Amino acid sequence: QRQMCIRDRSNTESLNIGKKRGFLTIYIGYSPGVGKTFEMLSNAIELFQSNVDIKIGYIEPHQRDETNALAEQLPKITTNFTKHGSHHFQYLDVDRIIEESPTIVLIDELAHTNISRDRHEKRYMDIEEILNHGIDVHTTLNIQHIESLSSQIELMTGVHVKERVPDYFIMSADVLEVVDISPE
């Protein structure tokens, strides 16, 4: 099931003089596993097949074969790696995305906290920078990560969420696409 809210932001300027700010599309769902990344990738493949310059900037590794198969059908921008303790992590390469400057870049997990905080503490800050370079971004978010809703959702679910995205960022989205699993 899908619902879509679209805003007209045709006059939105970026911080770069003369360049329009990129458009932000957020695929939002009530919990992990409802199909946000799958939906984002499915829509991206349709755009790619229509000759839109669309690339994957970062997709969270999934245990779902169907999602991974979709990701394999799209070009990818090389990611960076960092070490934290004994673990190695893959992360978004903001410089490379800006350098390659696709029309649209896919970036999974909007609420993510960056382990390597050399540039920005949070992924939504990375996305803001990319948008300000005129690149459209499609991203995913679980509703419990919205700052103004997280405490209410914690009361209902008993689950505390540390990673939060400020309301102003959500409100800046050009498209909010609600993704939900059918009760069947």
Task: Label each residue range with its predicted role.
Residues 7-20:
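Pre-Walker A adenine-sensing motif
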Residues 122-143, 165:
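Substrate-engagement module of ASCE P-loop NTPases
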Residues 109-124, 148-151:
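Conserved ATPase-coupling elements of RecA-like P-loop NTPase cores
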Residues 21-95, 99:
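Conserved P-loop
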Residues 139-184:
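Internal gly/pro-rich beta-alpha loop/helix module
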Residues 1-6:
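Short, small-residue-biased leader/transition segments that mark boundaries at the very start
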